[in-house]
Amino acid sequence: MKFIIKLFPEITIKSQSVRLRFIKILAGNIRNVLKHYDETLAVVRHWDNIEVRAKDENQRLAIRDALTRIPGIHHILEVEDVPFTDMHDIFEKALAQYREQLEGKTFCVRVKRRGKHEFSSIEVERYVGGGLNQHIESARVKLANPDVTVHLEVEDDRLLLIKGRYEGIGGFPIGTQEDVLSLISGGFDSGVSSYMLMRRGCRVHYCFFNLGGAAHEIGVRQVAHYLWNRFGSSHRVRFVAINFEPVVGEILEKVDDGQMGVVLKRMMVRAASKVAERYGVQALVTGEALGQVSSQTLTNLRLIDNVSDTLILRPLISYDKEHIINLARQIGTEDFARTMPEYCGVISKSPTVKAIKAKIEAEEENFDFSILDKVVEEANNVDIREIAQQTQQEVVEVETVSGFGANDVILDIRSIDEQDDKPLKVEGIDVVSLPFYKLSTKFGDLDQSKTWLLWCERGVMSRLQALYLREQGFANVKVYRP
């Protein structure tokens, strides 16, 4: 099988040296992501595209899907590469490829040509289009908005029959820009802002301020691992978890109620800046949007920025909540965010929307900054690839089984879309569907006399959710890995 990778247009307008560097990085990213599917896979760089060739036909769909999620790719063409002799030979090959697809449809032919030939692209379009129209009685030519567009590419003596076109996510290849540290909470905003910086070519590390205990951290780990695995797995990144409960306790005890929200955000920026400096990261990323909550007014944001020299990027600053939720839905983080607890909003009953610098600084004089230094020093830093492995170790008390007993029921915790695409059927045992994002509210409604075997495709989510349910007091859960 063969795929032609078309570059994001902004890459093509770079200078020659920059363009070549971007293409080289993108090719490396593609190779890093796809090597898990086919070790014999070949990635070949060209000036205006990248060619991907693989032998394992069983991995066609997986490879195609992975390519659509790699930043820097505008679109992917799945092609069949064949030799040709003349224009009539091109028509015959196009007829064999597209006959069934064009039955009863309107169509047009679009040709791109490179090399020296005795014909032009328009001449090929007319010849092939006329021939298809004559030989397929139920098809009819329609140049504007046809049902099917027949894409052909002619390069020297080779014809590329385009079997399918699939849109990529665009943007710049990860690694073409410098690293950033995303302050991730697991909600709608931080997930989307992290994705936007990945799409813009940054390697995104994650910094999580834990205000809600182990269950909260498990949920945020899921979001970070999902984002990395889906859009950024070409690079290693860090997940840094900081226990911020001592800091919150100090704020609650020492800081005036109305100033708590701004002071908390200033403490978070101070801590994140220390982490960024430690690892040589150039900027912080937050999901703040102007006016969304009390701490996100221009006055308050300016005061928050003042505590650090580190650049703070806010890609969602002008976005409304509906737009952010729609983006979260598109990238697949909506379900995580809907069930993620929100802790920052409950710290102050009457938050100020226009904090005064002198008053904030006066309140912070009462704060014991050694507490902040200590929680940063004790931060838990892991390679995000180890999250699944760590989860395996953490849930050692949750039994993993490959078989089942008479009282067992398999609980398919994949998302609804995944279940619809690939339903789970296991002979000899009932399978119940309950998406992972409903477990926290719906698991208790299930028959608790049964033993529930949690299952997902890769086993990461099922282990994380098993740990979460155990912490909630449910002992009747196991992880199912056949």
UniProtKB/Swiss-Prot annotation:
Transmembrane segments: none annotated. GO terms for cellular component: cytosol. Disulfide bonds join C344-C456. Residues 404-482 form the Rhodanese domain. One of its GO terms (molecular function) is CCA tRNA nucleotidyltransferase activity. Pathway: Cofactor biosynthesis; thiamine diphosphate biosynthesis. It is found in: Cytoplasm. Its EC number is 2.8.1.4. One of its GO terms (biological process) is tRNA 4-thiouridine biosynthesis. Keywords: ATP-binding, Cytoplasm, Disulfide bond, Nucleotide-binding, Redox-active center, RNA-binding, Thiamine biosynthesis, Transferase, tRNA-binding. It catalyses: [ThiI sulfur-carrier protein]-S-sulfanyl-L-cysteine + a uridine in tRNA + 2 reduced [2Fe-2S]-[ferredoxin] + ATP + H(+) = [ThiI sulfur-carrier protein]-L-cysteine + a 4-thiouridine in tRNA + 2 oxidized [2Fe-2S]-[ferredoxin] + AMP + diphosphate; [ThiS sulfur-carrier protein]-C-terminal Gly-Gly-AMP + S-sulfanyl-L-cysteinyl-[cysteine desulfurase] + AH2 = [ThiS sulfur-carrier protein]-C-terminal-Gly-aminoethanethioate + L-cysteinyl-[cysteine desulfurase] + A + AMP + 2 H(+). ATP binds at L183, I184, K265, G287, Q296. Belongs to the ThiI family. This is tRNA sulfurtransferase. It comes from Salmonella arizonae (strain ATCC BAA-731 / CDC346-86 / RSK2980). The gene is thiI.
